[in-house]
Amino acid sequence: YFGIMDKLSIKRMDEEVFDRIYYKDAIYDYAMGHERFMETLCHSFPHERENLKRYVAAIRSVGNLISTDHLKKGRLSQEGMNFFATSAAGMIASVTTNRDLQNVLAATSLLYGGIKNKSTFYEHAMINNSYLESAYRFTEGSMQVSLELIHIIRANGGTVLNRKEVTRILVKDETIQGVEVNHEEILESTYVISNLHPQLTLSLLDKNHSIKPAFVSRIKSLENSYGIFTLNLMMKKDCCPYQNHNIYLHGNEDVWYDKEMHKGNTPSCMISMQVPRGNSKFTEVVSILTPMYMDEVSKWTDTTPEHRGEAYRQFKEEKTEQILQLLRRFGFHWNHYIEKIHTTTPLSYRDYTGTIDGSAYGIVKNYQYPQILSLIHI
């Protein structure tokens, strides 16, 4: 962890329940640890023990592929690529025919931008196995990771530049020369590592013969994942009891988000609470996330933050009320706890992170086309 792990302020989530699923008038808990996870779900699905064993074994096998030794190689093993060519929903269905259990096992698909007819079992298993091994929350916000990384970079002779937008990646004789910053300053370098969306990275590159136009067109044509509508509730002091687990609410029988079917609606959401300060037992901030595609805010595509107009504000208020209605449906009557509300849409993600379409997870990883992953080196 670059020597920062012992400097981070984190809190271990409840081992008995780190994720709580509300589905079809019932509550299901994800417990930490592979055996505990299986035993906990067996209380709700007593006849599914053997199938749950098979499921746990499957996600564990993927988890073994993302060890440090594997990741240092820079590429997925052939076994890993096989899981990329396997449907998440299909794999779950092959493990159990119980529809309720299928949906409970897929209930946290928001964590990887899950799409029922596209998402890979690799994504599903990698995320779920990681949480089963250990689940934590930051107690002082995630910004501390950035600050500690900055300290490490500087301690090793590096420089971190703020307010510096890379506006061009310089190429000469098929070799990287450096980057242009803010359309004026040139920083020379032998290597450029970009964590931008591949489409953005390619748009910054000088013309060259190494990357073919057909490849660029292919990358531009790839579908991006949905974005996120985020509702941040600032709670009144000592009003909202802290819960040391995430909460997933699902109002439909099928927990997978569907672009066409759910457009304009809020069938599901994830709820996460900020760890209280000091010895308080009450949270001050509740964050609620629900999927949203850029299509829903496309009429404001050409606007900038704080200048989107009254119609945009009204749109966000209506979405907020949809979410609060979903919460009330499951017994979370928090309206009288709320002091202030802040919201973000895929437009916010686009403008502050530069990601295409305000996507939360970048290019969709489609199990039907695993070869695409080798092209973009994911």
State the predicted function of each range.
Residues 24-118:
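Rossmann-like flavin
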Residues 236-347:
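C-terminal segments that line or cap access tunnels to active or ligand-binding sites in enzymes
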Residues 104-136, 375:
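Active-site-adjacent "gating/activation" loops or surface patches in catalytic cores
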Residues 1-15:
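N-terminal FAD cofactor-binding segment of flavoenzymes
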Residues 100-112, 332-376:
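A glycine-rich dinucleotide-binding beta-alpha-beta segment and adjacent secondary-structure elements
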Residues 162-177, 181, 343-355:
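Beta-rich nucleic-acid/ligand-interaction surfaces
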Residues 137, 167-281:
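Mid-domain catalytic core of redox enzymes
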Residues 126-176:
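Helical element adjacent to the flavin cofactor pocket in flavoenzyme catalytic cores
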